[in-house]
Amino acid sequence: MRRIILISYLICLILLVSSKAYCQIHIKFQIGGQEKEVIPRVESVVMQNDSVISFSTFNTSNTELTIPAKGAYKISLSAHNYQPWESNLNLRNDTVINVIMQKSPIALQEVVVKGTKTPTVTATGETFYLSSKARKEKDPFKALSEIPVLKVNPISQSITTRDGSSPLILIDGRLVNSGINPILPADIESVTVEDVVSARYLDQDINKIINIHLRKERPLYVYFEERTRHDIPLRKGFVGSNFEIGRSHFAVYGSVFYNYLTKDRIDYETLEKRNDQQKQLIGSNISRKNDFDLKLLFKYEPNARNYFAWNISNRISNMHKSATYNGEYLNNNISNKMIANDHTKDKSNGWLGSFFYEHTFKDKSSLDVYSYFNHAKANRRQQYAEHIISDLIPTFLSLDNIRNQVGLDVDYNGVRHKYGQIEAGNHFLYTHDNLWDNVFSPSVLTHVSQSSNYSYISYSKVWKKIMLMTSVGLQGLFVKVDSRSDSYWRPKMSVAIGFRVSKSQTARLSYTLNNILPSPQQLVPVSSSVNPWQKVEGNMNLRPIQTHDLALTYDIKILDWLRLQTFAKHKITTNMIESFLRKENNYVIQSYRNNGCYNRWNTGFGLSINSNSVQAYLSPALSWEHYEGGNRLSSWGLNGNLTWWALDQMAIQVEAEWKNKSYSAISITKYSNPMSANISMAWYPTDNIQISAGITYLGGIREQITTIDTPNYYQRQKMSFHSESFRPWILFAYTIRKHNKLRIENKMPYFDMDR
């Protein structure tokens, strides 16, 4: 009896397995290129009802795929340098599918590039293509470090251009706020570095752009990153996480970070003179600060033509400063001992909510709509007291600020035609600040409202070796401070002409016209200083400034690994807003005024070295400045960096920057040693782990001296940054990127909550 039961059980089990195997569908792919070339690596994704059933990789010896059961499926194939292949199939039986994959053309500035790694020169910049070695990297910053016109720090995850500017990062031409961290280098088609921006970005005070073009496949993906960095001993650090998870049509991105600063010491030596009085103080300022940043982004792409995104961000910041100074007070040559104490508390809390929609038309042109609302609160409490003999001279500062800001941007992006490319749009921004001065009773309330409405149109075209981009706009500026109202209409313009002298030489001439409103702090007639001798006040009569930037650059590719760029720039600022001093009763008032023209000339060169394991950059520059009614002021600067990759798993990076002087309309600052001198090392034991260590500032104790010298007032202040000088630190990061090629692109525009 037992034998019969056992045999019956085995027969049922065999039948069950057989039926299961019988229900499976086997698909054999015969994959090749248009020229019958063999494609060595093809990735496949099988989806059913928006769920991923299978994700696998084919090679020349394995092109078979197994489907669990009969039904309707969506099958996608992708390969490097080939256009993706997709098909919706209703599978009932085993089948053989022949697939011919077409190579991907990349159209940029009317230049179509197929299968080439040679950089493409445009009217506004240059487009680069990552090497096969860079595409195999897991860290996008490590991959981007091979671009010769960028200075990339994979340890701090930062990117700057050759002149030290922090560029705006775009993904496929769209502003983003989640950065490039989730990107897998294999998904990067090209990287465009734009030195001249169109009128669309002028109202955002953007002058450099990095545009990263991605492949179009969008599989199921998961991205998670944990990062923590700390000085030794503890002074400055952070801990936080980034994550992104989603399917082919919906995704959620989040970021949570805590930043801190503690026991940060800065030493001061201050000398002040006024009439027959003199103060000389020496002491230290100890700071501590805590920041909390939260970001959530929801992305929804119902189809290839429509994209939606919702974002919410919160930033909370608290800072405390405490200082004690000792010295002497001199009045009519009579000296007395003096002690001063300073205590400051700053708090801020800002929220940002935004919505973004993009619609793509049949001809691949697109319409973008971006709306946002920002609400922020900030307050400062400061108490300063001077003790001279038995006298106590206290000064208080108590300011509260509430800001509400709303914006709406509408942009049309045309496609490239034989006659060129056209873009147009309108940007509206309204900002309202309520500022309370609580020192008085009752509190004094000041209202500041600023509006900007900006319309523009851009045109670009390429004629063989000549490339043109021209962009013009009209901006309406409206300012109201309490009962005073002003309105202005100003033009905006951006023009760039590029000329390809030869395959290795390019010249570019550019001109930019822009307008900048005064900040609310420059407009409010409320003192923001606790110095008993000096007040700092705004001026509600300020007008917008206008800037004219003219630049000429000449790029030479000397060798495959060696590039030289020479540049000459001239900036003219009319209605220049500058600081000035005036005497009023027993006070020296520092305020702001529109004072004619400001001119700045800048010239220099940059030398880039980019070999297999070494990236280096060195750039000296000379500058001349001229304020209205003043003398011509000169300065020089030098910045450089060196990155050496050892065995592809370890990087050593050195960064340094020198500058001898900087100027304002009333002061001069001298730097006695380098402004920065850092060394760091990163080790990647696995694709998921990064361990880094370094030393901040190797140039001794960083110091600077600022001097104000006028007939009515003299001040000399020396600052020594003890805590940040020669400070070791350590960083640990753990990153997971799974099936990143199916990620939804993040097109939500970036919003700076500090602007």
What residue ranges belong to the model's regions?
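Short, acidic, small-residue-rich periplasmic hinge/interaction motif at the N-terminus
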Residues: 34, 42-47, 78-80, 96-133, ...
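N-terminal periplasmic accessory domains that precede
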Residues: 96-100, 110, 140-143, 158-159, ...
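Periplasmic plug
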Residues: 153-197
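Outer-membrane beta-barrel translocator/receptor signature
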Residues: 203-210, 217-266, 289-292
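Transmembrane beta-strands of outer-membrane beta-barrel pores
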Residues: 227-232, 247, 258-262, 314-320, ...
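Face-selective signature of the C-terminal outer-membrane beta-barrel domain
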Residues: 293-319, 341-484, 488-494, 500-504, ...
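Outer-membrane beta-barrel signature, preferentially recognizing the C-terminal barrel domain
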Residues: 515-565, 572, 590-602, 719, ...
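C-terminal beta-signal and adjacent terminal beta-strands/loops
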Residues: 684-755
